[in-house]
């Protein structure tokens, strides 16, 4: 296979991996945790995965602590948890 063909194959595999949704079986366990604002008193908007609706939702994060179901952007939440 030529180097151009290998690059095309690599590009297609990368695209497939990015666009393939995470199945609930393969979803990280932290995606099922409830939103946890943490002990600090800041007011930062963050996103958490809501398994019942299969959507990422916004919540107010205190700025420290909490759990791993906490993402700076909706896009990062969806990539990690949406199936």
UniProtKB/Swiss-Prot annotation:
Residues 1-24 form the signal peptide. GO terms for molecular function: serine-type endopeptidase inhibitor activity; toxin activity. Keywords: Disulfide bond, Protease inhibitor, Secreted, Serine protease inhibitor, Signal, Toxin. One of its GO terms (cellular component) is extracellular space. It is found in: Secreted. The keyword Protease does not apply. Residues 31-81 form the BPTI/Kunitz inhibitor domain. Disulfide bonds join 31-81, 40-64, 56-77. CDD domains: Kunitz_textilinin-like. Negative results: does not inhibit vasopressin V2 receptor (V2R/AVPR2). Belongs to the venom Kunitz-type family. This is Kunitz-type serine protease inhibitor isoform 5. It comes from Bungarus flaviceps flaviceps.
């Amino acid at each position: 296979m030529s180097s151009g063909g290998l690059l095309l194959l690599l590009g297609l595999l990368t695209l497939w991996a990015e666009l393939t949704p995470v199945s609930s079986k393969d979803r990280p366990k932290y995606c099922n945790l409830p939103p946890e604002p943490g002990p600090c008193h800041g007011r930062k908007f963050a996103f958490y995965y809501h398994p019942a609706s299969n959507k990422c939702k916004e919540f107010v994060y205190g700025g420290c602590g909490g759990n791993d179901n906490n993402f700076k952007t909706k896009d990062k939440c969806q990539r990690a948890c949406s199936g």
